[in-house]
Amino acid sequence: MRHRTGFNPLSCMAAHRRALRRNMVTSLFKFERITTTKPKAAEVRRAAERLITRSKSDSVHNRRQVARFIWDKAVLHKLFADIGPRMREREGGYTRILKLGLRQGDAAHVVVLELVDYTFEKSLKKRARTDSVPARKGAGKKDASRVSGTVPDGQSQKIGKKKE
């Protein structure tokens, strides 16, 4: 019996899994909140917690270790200048997973992965968008000839009957 042969948590190759984790962690630190599936969020959470722990003490060694994982210099700077100091008093549990429900297309469990001190009001100020859908061009105007049964030159005739 072959024990422990079933390791493939995201059903993808190792290089793709590594790139996926790296990109999602970078997005998490950049936007401080991402929406994804539950298994991906669990993988990203594990990596993000380790990187935040390293970013709490700003040293050359820690910067280089984190830079192996996060290639975006702006996100790396944000991690060490903003996120790390904010989490300095916390001993772990820097992220939270909020369940959103099932995705309609494939019934996958969708969750929100966010940093613990993330505030929703802060993001609302950044994205001031309206919830209304813009109307189509010309919506609401009806063709007068179709409604009243008039011909465009002004003569009226009955709709549906031919003149013989």
UniProtKB/Swiss-Prot annotation:
Stored Pfam families: Ribosomal_L17
MF terms in GO: structural constituent of ribosome
Gene3D superfamilies: Ribosomal protein L17
UniProt key word Thylakoid: no
Transmembrane segments: none
GO cellular component entries: cytosolic large ribosomal subunit
Swiss-Prot/TrEMBL keywords: Ribonucleoprotein, Ribosomal protein
Keyword match Ribonucleoprotein: yes
Domain of life: Bacteria
Annotated region described as Disordered, given as residue ranges: 127-164
InterPro entries with a match to the protein in the record: Ribosomal_bL17, Ribosomal_bL17_CS, Ribosomal_bL17_sf
GO BP: any one term: translation
Family the entry assigns: Belongs to the bacterial ribosomal protein bL17 family.
Subunit: Part of the 50S ribosomal subunit. Contacts protein L32.
Protein name: Large ribosomal subunit protein bL17
